[in-house]
Amino acid sequence: MSVRKRYKVTYVLDSCNDQLGHRLDANCLVLGRYFSEQGSAPVTRALYSGGRDGQLFGWDIGYDYGKASQPLAKIQAHSAWVNDIALTHDSEGVISCSSDSTVKLWKPHVLNASCLSTIGEHTDYVKRVSIPKYSKSPLVASGGLDKRIIVWDYNVGQEVMRFEQLPDCSLVVGPRSGVYSLAANNNIIANGGLQKDIQLWDCVSKKRITDLVGHTDNVRDILISDDGRTILTASSDATIKLWSLRAQKCLFSFIAHSDSVWALYSEHPDLKVFYAGDRSGLITRTDIRNQPNNQSCTAICKQDAPVSDIVARQSFIWSTSRDGSILRWKDEPLFNQDVGAALSKHTSSHLSVSSDCPSRHSSDIRNHSCPTLYHDDAEDIYYDLHHTESYSNINLTKTPDYVIHGGIGLLKYRMLGDRRHVLTEDAVGNKCLWDILACKQAGEFDKSEDFEKIVQSLDTVQAIPRWASVNCLLGILAVTLDENHYMDAEIYADECPLLKVDSPSDKRINLGVWILKNLFREFIDAELHRDLKFRQNLDVVRSEAKKQIEAQREEARKGNVNMPSALSPLRIRSRPSPLSLPPEPLLSPTIDYSATPFPLEPPPESPGPSLQIPSNNPVYTNLTDTDSMMGAPDYFSIPARQNRNRKPHTEVVGSPTVVRTKEIIPPKVTREGSFMGRLKKLGRSKSSKSLQTDFMKASVERAASSRVFSTGTSVTSPQALSKTNNTVNNAANTENNTLAKDKQQTSEASSPGTPRELKTTGELIEDLHEQYVHFKDKDTVLSLMKPPNDDTFPMLNLSSQITVIISEESPEAGNSRDIYRSTLENMADDIDLLENIMPFWLGRLLLLNEFPSKTAPTVNFTLQPFPGSGLPLIVNENTRLSASAMLRAQKIMDYSYSKLSQQRKDVSSLQFRCKDVVVTPKMTLATVKARIWRSGDDVVFHYDVAPRSVSEIVDKTQSLNI
């Protein structure tokens, strides 16, 4: 049984679209070239960067690497941190991995939507990617916290091989952990992590070779030499170790750093010259090419932030820093003697081999003739550095040669009690108030003002349920709605300045539905237009369908019983890869690599009711102009025992009988051959003859599968069809038993009244079209689409640059993944894609105005006269009243006054108090209970005669500590 996926809708509010630079810290760097739009020749040299804001940048550094860097290209590639990037061999593509569990390919020189494609996915954060050096194959290895290493073909986006850690992967150190460091060549993949050792994998046998044990903390970075004989590793234990792969031993341990070493970089084929950066900001260069020379380790510079990645070329070093900045340093030695000798008086005058590195041998590849720890070959090549002092007392260079400044990202946010406004603060102290319903800034505040004091001054006594969540994980404000809570909040029309002034005082509007309708307005308009085109061509569809059925009858009489060819195109909807088009090859532009089609899910064996979506409460309700979305009355009532024999009144809107047919997958199915693929051409500019031809083909497929016509009579009964299928199955070979069972299930599924579970908006539209075909020929076919009314949910003036994201969550995945991302400006071009990936609950809301009904929260309360007022009881003091949490106090006041006026004629108006705080007429029961009563017990209201003048009212509402 497959677990249903959950879908979310996120829209992003960004007031700094034109800023150049990472909004948050940059995480990774790589040097390469930048090509022209045609990709024929490189234009300049480029530095590519990925950051915690999910963005990728390409910076122009010139052919001499000393140019003042300007951005060449940028893209919002991921919805979470970019953890690592690598460059393809031809420098035309940047491969990135992210905490959103995806590995993606970006072609910076491509300016259309195909510039970004998804290569593959992990089930948890992806921490590292590595491309074998000098390899001619389009392969990239990725490792993540799901404890897997996967090798991908980045040209076609397919998995080539995978390595998965076993529970006992590290017998010496401990249990398996995620992949935090990764390096690969043509034959071997090395990875490290929290298990503290380095694991070696053979790409030929696809098995783990051995483990290299020596570090005492997390292994943060790994480099492999060009010949594959040595490995250089950096660890959080502040050491850098050089390993011999043939001897499987630690040759040398470099301890020039006093803090965790996070980054390594080397372009030397034997790793004899390498750069290192640590958590304290220190960057060093180590050169062990000359044995007699004691000037091996040189401190280059020290920055104020940790070094998460470094690259170097010629006489420059680039390092990542905080606030999205990238620093460029001149690679000039600062000392004329060994750093260790300058720092420690007890440093040995010669270099000696480290002898304290533990190791573990593997009998699988151990060669007795290979160099060992004390072998002469090892002594001739490598040397050890020993010093334990830090660089804190040395005047290192702290001013970079050039700075690529980052943008300004949001660091702090707070949603106010009205659930419509959010206060944010960015990296430089700017404080802004956002209206997440109008999708724009509502105000700005001085940098010197305290954030918490601003929140207290802006917050109100309103208590609105949380209908959306907000975050600034990428340095920008993102608002997320999920299918379980987007309907939870309503506001009164007279409290919203975005609505008309003359709106009725008791009118309520749902915030989630309002914003969703406006975000997808282009989609709604396009589907209404397509729906009209389809209904205008129904006669052609029905006529051609009848002809096809007659032809099938004739074939059946001749003994050639075949399943209708329309069954397959009807139900199979090709789902394109989200956020990308079919990837184009980087290395061989002349070869056509087609994208892997989205896997088709078989129909459920026991299909559920028609138009049903699994939920906690799968009852759908239609929203009218006057009904409340919460489905609860505004007026309170005395709770009474329910009659168990009484059936609850449930109104299910728009659930006609739908004919369910089982999918029979033909050898080849293309998008153009599907039912919806042909129907969608109606909304495009084509000749009437072409339109009729398309609908004739569609009619054959749809009517043949359902076997039901406008008169409502069945052409071939399900029993006859089943009998025919059984005859064919009995005559078939025993090798075709599986196919026979499928046909039997198909005949059962094709019975009228057998519904299916709908998963996407495209399937919902198909079922609507099916219902149109079943209408009587002479009937006026009215549209079944009823989107949210404009009077109830008026149009909002939203910016066309707002980004909309649809993401999905599955239990097996560590986090959600984006399946659609676009701006409101470009949404009109993605209608076909949205039909395929938009979740059913969202399509049902946008096109049918139907949604799962929810029981509105209620508040229990009692009414008592204020002590000393002399007023009588309205109801028994032990009587508990109950009403919707959204009910305003004015309704309770009116009810109490009507009851009290029957006993006292001298009472003109009433005043309500709760805990000695005056309750204003517009307060809701939810606000009173959450902000004033603040207890789980029943709310107690005291009523008194209202003062004659406003000055006599002691309103303590403003003094509430909220």
Curated annotation (Swiss-Prot):
Subunit structure, interactors included: Interacts with ubp9 and bun62.
Role: Required for the ubp9 recruitment to septa and cell tips but also for its enzymatic activity at these specific locations.
Keyword annotations: Cytoplasm, Phosphoprotein, Repeat, WD repeat
Protein's recorded name: UBP9-binding protein bun107
InterPro entries given in the database record: WD40/YVTN_repeat-like_dom_sf (IPR015943), WD40_repeat_dom_sf (IPR036322), WD40_rpt (IPR001680), WDR48 (IPR051246), WDR48/Bun107 (IPR021772)
Matches recorded under PANTHER family: WD REPEAT-CONTAINING PROTEIN 48 (PTHR19862:SF14)
Low complexity bias spans: 568-578, 724-738
Domain of life from the UniProt record: Eukaryota
Residue ranges, compositional bias (Polar residues): 707-723
Keyword Repeat: yes
GO biological process: double-strand break repair via homologous recombination
Residue positions where Phosphoserine is found in the record: 717
Species in which this protein is naturally found: Schizosaccharomyces pombe (strain 972 / ATCC 24843) (Fission yeast)
Pfam families: DUF3337, WD40
CDD domains: Ubl_WDR48, WD40
Coiled-coil blocks: none
PROSITE patterns membership: WD_REPEATS_1, WD_REPEATS_2, WD_REPEATS_REGION
Region spans: Disordered: 568-615, 702-758
An annotated GO cellular component: cell tip
